[in-house]
Amino acid sequence: MEARFLQLSDVAEVLNVSASQVYHMVRSGELPAIKIGGRGQWRVERTRLEAYIEQKHTETAQWIKENPLTLRDDAEDAI
């Protein structure tokens, strides 16, 4: 059985970003998390992380739809 909550380092591994980036996402409210224990360690619920990833997929698809690739963009990427 998978753990319900993930440490920020685990979230960073899933998202392929640094732990400090995940911490910033949590502190800014972008990624929902809870603070537990006497030392106040952050935990992200696995289902919330999956919802966050789905939200980012949706936002990215919408951005791509609103910002289609142009020939100029394609030429710049080739450089």
Describe each PLM feature range.
Residues 15-42:
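Major-groove DNA-recognition helix of helix-turn-helix-type DNA-binding domains
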Residues 1-16, 20, 24, 46-79:
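Basic Lys/Arg-rich amphipathic helical interaction modules
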